[in-house]
């Protein structure tokens, strides 16, 4: 009997689980894969909705949990949480001894998993390398993960070329599309109206989703927030604020959003939604407003407009459904108004998403289940030097 491949996948929060859900489903079901799902960070935090429960509810399963997140709202707290994660994951991976570890995207917590994998000589597979988000530390994290990894699954061909330009051997780099788009193509989403009603919205009336996070590359990570709230104060329609990521400044975002919601009965603050409920709510929204990659990468797949505020997503590819705007109240108001015009709404129906077709999981599975995970994967070689 063929030995099963020991593959560990790390997940820290709803931010990456919404991408990983179908890949975890396929890995768990594959007869030649021994999957270990390791959850840590915000997943285990009651403050951020204890989203580890989403994994079990979706059938992904959780094999190991590692407590790592300090109760903090500072950059020092982030740095210390990273150290705690490194200690905890070192023990976990030393005991599990996976043959391959899968990390996703650009969350700073992933650096802990990558560092442990490096020192334990475990090959690393990285999903979503080569993307850009120049207004956050995520960009540097993503590039660091690329150089620490041995397999790369990129969202676009442009991202694939960037990874190769960083010195990675082309055979290691696979363009698969964005994993999160598999949420649209695999199974039917719950009715948007039903999800809206469950969180207190009037399903018959328009709603806007606001998804915004601290700009972690800035000293004042929430400097954009007053302009955002000023713009939203004159918006006609229901508003759903989604909790931010667990970064420095997140509590400021939560506090001000909650205060804003207290002044208007049509404003709701949601800690977390399961991935498919979030996608359903987004599919029925008038627009998504904020600085989340969800608007830039995902909204086009459900033909929804996105207003991208500020610098957090600078450099990231996006479709024509996205309207970029500086963090200025009047500019934000004008951008929202543009997305609600009849011509823009009509054009949305035919706008393409540059991040793929929603079949990324099956492409990743083909590589993970066939690639040689021996020494040839672990040992990387620099590209040949140009000769004069």
Regions found by a protein language model. Name each.
Residues 23-33, 231-235:
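A short, Lys/Arg-enriched amphipathic alpha-helix followed by its capping loop at the start of a domain
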Residues 44, 190-284:
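Donor-nucleotide binding loops and adjacent catalytic segments primarily
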Residues 44-46, 149-221:
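A nucleotide-sugar donor-handling region in carbohydrate enzymes
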Residues 341-388:
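C-terminal amphipathic helix plus adjacent low-complexity
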């Amino acid at each position: 009997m063929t030995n099963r491949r020991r593959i560990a996948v790390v997940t820290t929060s709803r931010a990456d689980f919404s991408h990983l859900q179908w890949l975890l489903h396929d890995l768990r079901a594959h007869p030649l894969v021994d999957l270990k799902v390791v959850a840590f960070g915000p997943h285990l935090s009651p403050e951020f909705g204890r989203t580890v429960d989403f994994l079990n509810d979706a059938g992904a399963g959780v094999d190991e949990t590692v407590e790592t997140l300090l109760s903090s709202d500072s950059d020092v707290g982030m740095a210390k949480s990273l150290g705690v994660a490194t200690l905890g994951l070192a023990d976990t991976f030393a005991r599990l001894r996976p043959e391959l570890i899968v990390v996703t995207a650009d969350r700073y917590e992933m650096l802990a998993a990558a560092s442990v994998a490096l020192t334990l000589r475990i090959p690393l597979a990285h999903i979503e390398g080569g993307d850009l988000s120049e207004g956050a530390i995520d960009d540097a994290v993503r590039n660091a993960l690329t150089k620490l990894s041995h397999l790369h699954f990129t969202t676009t061909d442009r991202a694939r070329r960037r990874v190769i330009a960083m010195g990675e051997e082309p055979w290691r780099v696979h363009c698969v599309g964005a994993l999160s788009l598999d949420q649209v193509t695999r199974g039917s989403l719950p009715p948007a109206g039903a999800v809206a009603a469950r969180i207190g919205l009037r399903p018959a009336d328009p709603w806007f989703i606001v998804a915004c996070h601290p700009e972690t590359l800035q000293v004042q990570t929430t400097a954009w927030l007053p302009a955002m709230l000023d713009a939203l104060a004159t918006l006609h329609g229901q508003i759903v604020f989604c909790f931010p990521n667990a970064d420095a400044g997140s509590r400021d975002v939560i506090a001000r959003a909650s205060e804003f919601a207290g002044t208007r009965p049509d404003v709701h603050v949601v800690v977390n939604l399961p991935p498919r409920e979030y996608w359903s709510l987004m599919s029925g929204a008038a627009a998504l407003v904020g600085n989340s990659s969800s608007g830039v990468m995902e909204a086009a797949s459900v033909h929804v407009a996105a207003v991208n505020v500020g610098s957090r997503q600078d450099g990231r590819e996006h479709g024509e459904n996205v309207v970029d705007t500086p963090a200025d109240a009047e500019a934000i108001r004008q951008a929202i108004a543009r997305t609600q015009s009849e011509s823009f709404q009509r054009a949305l129906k035919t706008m393409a998403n540059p991040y793929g077709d929603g079949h990324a999981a099956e492409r990743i599975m083909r590589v993970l289940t066939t690639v040689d995970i021996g020494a040839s994967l672990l040992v990387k070689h620099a590209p040949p030097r140009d000769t004069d």
